Structure formats: structure tokens, C-alpha cells
Amino acid sequence: MGRKNLVEFFHDYFSPRSNYLEYDNGFRRWSYAYCETAEAARVFAARLKAAGVRRGERVLLWSESRPEWVFAFWGSLLAGAVVVPVGAESSSEFVSRVADVARPRVVALGEDVRLDAEVSAQVLRLAREDWKGPSNALESPAVTRDDLAEIVFTSGSTGEPKGVEITHGNLLSQIEAVELWMVRIRKFLRPFFPIRLLQLLPLSHMFGQAAALSLAPLTRASVVMTRRQNPAALAELIRTRGVCSVVCVPRVLDAFRALASQQIRTEPRPSGSGPSAWQPEALVRNLWRARHIRRTFGWRFLGFVVGGAALDPELERFWSRLGYLVVQGYGLTETSPVISLNNPLHPRAGSVGQLFPGVKARIAPDGEILVRGPNVSRGYYNEPERTFDAMRDGWLHTGDLGSLDEEGYLYIRGRKKEMIVTPEGVNIFPEDVERVLDGVSGVRESAVVGLPLLGDDRQEHVHAVLELAPGRDAGEVMAEANRRLESYQRIRGVFVWPEEALPRTGQTGKLKRAEIRDRIAAERAAKPVNGHPARGSTTADMVTEEIERRTGRGASAESSLDELGLSSVDRVEMLLEFEGRSGQSMEESEFAAARTVGDLKAAVERAVKSGEPGAAERARFPSWNRNSLARLVRETNLSLWVLPLARFLGRPTVEGLQNLNRVKPPVIFAANHESNLDAPLILAALPGEWRRRIAPAMYKEFFDPHFSPENYSLTRKLLSSIVYYLIALIGNAFPIPQEEAGVRDVLRYAGELVSEGWSLLIFPEGERRPADRHGAFRPGVGLLADRLEVPVVPVCVEGTGQVLPPQRVLPRRGRTRVIFGPPMRLEDRDPKVLAKQVQEAVASLAAAGFASLARR
């Protein structure tokens, strides 16, 4: 309490060894304790000081949400610098304009951004930084509560960035208020430990920072960050990681509602809503009726913390009826960020809660919410006129319209500047009309703006801009909505948006109404309402553009994928890209079966039109072979007969083991493939600490009778299953398909292994080859290395083809050699290029091995 700056809060809360940050890139997972975060932050602070960064100088963070963002944020504050966070979705041009205003000394970039413009600052890549290094005896500058901690830039009404000044005192006022509250409720949280928050708001957003950087340390919670966007994949992450709450914008709740609705179509609809849903009798009833949804999200999941945009009351009621908490908050960047928050133990439906401790608010005569308090920013960076306009009479003019009830609960009506004033002088709130439109069948998204009627440029009328399902008529939608609206709210004109989705802000998902209104006004020649063509084939365009980007050639629907040079890995990468952009799961088998561009377009369009976010069935992979009993059986068999037999038959010479001292597991061992003896000999050559944590890949199609038993006799099925389970048990092996179907699931399973600390052993040739005719390495090794972000250790095996050639059943003794090369950290994103690099590394080991033999 009474801290001088945020650095003191950091020292108070970032010493435990408990888990703090988890990062899931869609395939593998990383985790960092509070103390590891503190050490990484100190390393970054030392690096900034070595670069000459002084107190008050700016560090621009332009990155996706990832642990390194948190390291850099706290490291910047430890160095006395001012953080300038910019969302990963921002354009390079916007970042360049921000840099012109803020003049940062250092620019730290994430993996998903590309800075095209020149900046007069040192540029760092967060994911490539070494977060272990000298940080001892680091002294932070004497920063006070009045010093700037952040400058948060948003796009102003003129399109030019405006920087909101956030001081250490602004942030501490909110932290210390929560800290006092936590003292009272900590005992109630103990049954839910360990608390895990899924952070779906970007860290460049102030509400996202409040959850990850303030609330989580105060509750000793873990923060899970992810690159996943598909609702089904997110639900799987919530269930498997034991997430208690999701921090998000309302659009995420809407996406999850579509997923949950699939589970309750055949179930009685849960009854009750709002506070009554949390009465004991209603709660038990709702939990039972929503049991299928509970299995989808996991039984530890309690609900959502929502901010950044207005929440539809019906959406809130939907989740409350199912027994989930929906805690809604309200705030602005200028208020650091929280103005009000619903008490999770006493939520008020439809309200954004009561005022945060220390915050004062009043409603102006025109309905605008005015705020003041220690959390309110002192103004805009280098813009005194804009500061004066927003902070008149000591009150921050929020631009939002609302009301306060007798108990102090705040309700939001809409945005003042977005309100439509009809010719009759009636105020129309766009959100009210959008709520009705969104309830009309076939409406995927809607935006309501004020526009004059054709031929009359003086008065605004209500116009709707729609994103419709294929075949839905805009005129019919308007007529149906008008039947539900009050007479003064009725829509006078409607337009069909010609693109995939309505434009929204990247961080909070708010509609960009000004952009929508300006574009419709500029393209007024487009037919309004009836007869306006529905959305064009934007999904098909997306496929065409992606193919042309990868091949550099034009493509028609009849173009052959093979003739275009699209490999199986290209198709897998396109599948992952389309899933991320559409938010829908797609059948990998359809992608694998596609032969033309038209086939691919049809597969993508079927997934998008279905609107179903459900995940495809996961392939079968062994997890039982990693339990304690299986590991004991494996170690016993390997030690007693498997490895001694391999050493007896192969009499191996092992070279290059010293290269393993240069890397820590997990890694990918990539080897040439001459014989079925290769994997046992490599295991025999490895030191025990490596051998005990390795998972070799095996040829899935070899076990086709096990995986596709309907095509084989009972004898072949039984024999195949016995061999499969024996190899999976004794070798800890897992199946990899040779075709592209199933590659996505292989990536995810390999990610699970790597996340648990297991190294992988793969044979990128995909088949056994003679020593003098090694095959080309398939791009899968590059895809694994890129997506799992692990080093590759090249391995050359020689002589096994003489001991156990492919055509022989019984081996004969011989001499073999196993050579481990230096670890490779692959940075190119093209899997084919990466695979070629690994192939060349293995070939160089083979050449060195032959030269060594010649010298002997």
C-alpha cells in the first residue's frame, strides 16, 4: 500500500515460484513462473540500460500477446522507461506515425508484425531475445507516482494517433483498490486454486493489461495466452488447461454461444436468468441441464470477464441461464482503464456494475457520463488542446451515454457521437436497432448508421448495413426487423456489405461506424435495399489470393493443385490459415482429397457456410504410453534386451555427443533412414537422460489394419494391433501419416509431447533408402520445427542397411555409425526451405563420416 511506483508492486508480487504465464501457439505450450518472469524482466532492463535508455525515454512494444511482451513491459519500467504499447493488428504506417510522435529509443517487435518503415531506434525481436543473462545489482531510477508509465496510442477522429498518458499513480490507484478487496475475499477463492485466466484481450489494450499484469498477480493466478481463434479449439484449451475464467470482448461470448447451442439443441432449455439463476435450486437445475456444455468447457470453468465493448443483454442472459458468471466492466483507456465493474458475487444483469473505489461519476444533462478520480489520465501526449476539450471542468467527458440507478449501478445507453437524431428530434441508439437485426434469421452481422435519404442530404435517417447468409434477401430482413421495432426506430434504407465481415477495431471488436458510414456514403451508387446483390464470393477470393501468393501464378477453378506445385505441406498450411481467418474448423480429409482449386474453394465455403465452429474428430494417438507404469515397462525392456540386442547387431561407433551439450531438450532429432534398426541404434547411442525423454515417429500406413480394420481380416487386424501397441509401449512411438490428411493432428500431438519436455525422433525421407541413394527430406520436418519452435539436431546413421536391409527379415551383424550434428535453429518460415537445410546438414555428416573412414 502507498507504493511510490509500479516497480515496488513488481518486487512485492513477482517472486513466487508458482506458474504465472502460459503460452499456447496452437501446437505446443510454454510456461513461466513469477520468479522466471522477474528474472527475464531484469535481463531486459539491463539490456535497455546497456543500449543507453534513460529515465522517461520511450520503448515501443508492437507485438502479439506473448510472455515476452510481459517481460519487456516490466523490464522497461524497471529501467525507468515509458512503455508505448501498440496492437499487433496495427498497420506499419500507423506504427510509423506513432514512432514519429513518441520518438522511442527502442522498438520491440513480435513475430506476427513487420516494420516496413525506417525508425530512428534500436529494433529488437522479442521472440529471438536471450532472456537469460546478466541482471545482477540492477538499480531502478527514482520514479514517482506522477511519472509516466505508458503512452497508449489510439486513432483519433482525424485518423492521426492520439497518445493517452498513463502514470504510475493512475495504475497504482486501481491496483491498490483491488488489493484491499482481495484481502476480504481471498478465503473464498481458495477452493478454486490454482486460478487460471484465459487472456483473449490483447496486452496492448488497457483492460487486457489490468487482467494479466495486475489482477493475476494479486490473486496468484496463471495467465494463459494463445494464438488459437477457433471457438472449438479455445473450448478445448479451456477444458484441458483447467481455465476458470475467460477475459474477452463480447464477440467471444457470441462465438462460444454458437458452439454451446450445438450441445443444447436436444436438451431442455435452461430456465432462469440474471441473479435468480444463481439461487441454489435454479443453479442445480441449470448445472444439470447444461452438463453437456460443462463437459465441453470443463467443470473448473466459471464464466467470463467482459470489457471493451457493450454486451448484448440477451447474450448475458444466455450464459447466466446456463449457470455461468458474466462479469461486465466498463472503462476507457483514459481511465486506466476501469470505471465500474460488476461484483462477481452479486452481478446486476444489464449493468456494467458499480463505480470502482476512488472513481466518481455523474450524468450530464445530455446523458453523457462524466468521470474523475486518481485513475483518470492527465491528458494526451503533446496535445494540450485535445486534453482541455476532454477534461473540461475537472471531469473526463467519456463520450458515452448512460444512467446511474439508486444503488449506484451504471448502465450504458450508447455512444454520444454515434447517436442518430431523426428529423422528428428523436434520439436513436444504433445498438438498440442492431440488437433486433441480429435476431433476424440470416443476419450474421449488422451495423446501424445515420444517413440521409437519397435526394435529401439534410436529415439523418436510420440505415442498416448487413452481412447476410447466402441467399438471404436484404429487403425481407428490413421488413421483418421493422415489424419488431418501435415506429420511431424503423429502418429507412439497407445495404449489403460487400466483404467478408464488417470492419471492427482489432483490439476490442467495436464496430468502426464512421468508416462504414463514410464508405456507404461514398459508394451511394450501390443499390440500397431490394435487389442489392448478396455478398460476393469472398471466400473463393481468399483461396485464390492465397494460392497466387504461394505459387506466384494465376489460378482458375480448374487449375490442378499438383501442376501449381502445391505440396501436401502447402495444403496443411493453407488449412491452418483458413481456419484462423474464418473461425471455423475444416475437414482435413477434404483438403487432402482436393485435386483442383475449385475443390479447395468448395471445401472452404462448406465450412464457412455451415457456421458450425465444432472441431473435427481428432486422430487416435497414444497417451497411455507416457504414464508411470508404461515408462517403467519401457525402461525395463530397453535395458534388458532391446538396446543390448541393437548394440550386439550393429556394433555402433557414436560420434558428436558433445553437440548435445549445446542444447537443452526438447529438440527434434532428424535422421536419414536405411533400416528398421535405425531407431533402436539411435536410442542406444543417446545418453540415458535423453533416451528416457524421446518419442520416435513410426509409419502410420504400416499399421493400416489397426487404424482401418474394416478392410482387413480378423487375423491381420489382431496382428497389426499387437505390433502397434508393443512398439508404442516399448519404443514410446507415435504414428505419422505419409499423406497430408492427419498432419494437423500430428502437429498438435507433437506439440503436446514437446510441451511435456519430450524430444522427437523423425525420419524425414519417409521411407527406407540405401546408403548411396538417400531421398529428399519431406517438408514435414520444417513444418514441425517452425510450428513447435524447437531446434533440430541432424543425425546420420550409416551401415544399418547392411545389418537389416529392407528386404530381409533376419538381421546379420555388422558395423554401424551414429553421428550427431550441431543443433540447428531454423528461422525461415518456408517448410520446404527448412527441410532442405536439415537434409544438407545430414548429408554433410555423412560426407564427414566417409572421409573419416577413408582416413582410417
Model-derived regions, located:
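AMP-binding/adenylate-forming catalytic core of the ANL superfamily
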Residues: V107, I363, G373, R378-G379, ...
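Conserved AMP-binding/adenylation subdomain of ANL enzymes
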Residues: L172-R196, L203-R291, R300
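Conserved AMP-binding A3 loop
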Residues: S31-Y34, A149-E176
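Conserved C-terminal "lid"/linker of ANL adenylate-forming enzymes
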Residues: A447-G450, N482-A534
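Conserved ATP-dependent adenylate/AMP-binding module captured primarily in the ANL superfamily
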Residues: F73, A88-D116, W131-S135, Q174-L198, ...
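Conserved AMP-binding/adenylate-forming core of the ANL superfamily
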Residues: L21-R66, V70-W74, S91-S96, D100, ...
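Conserved pre-ATP/AMP-binding loop-to-beta segment of ANL
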Residues: N19, S135-F153, E160, R186-R196
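Non-catalytic C-terminal accessory region of glycerolipid acyltransferases
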Residues: A474-G475, A521, E740-R856
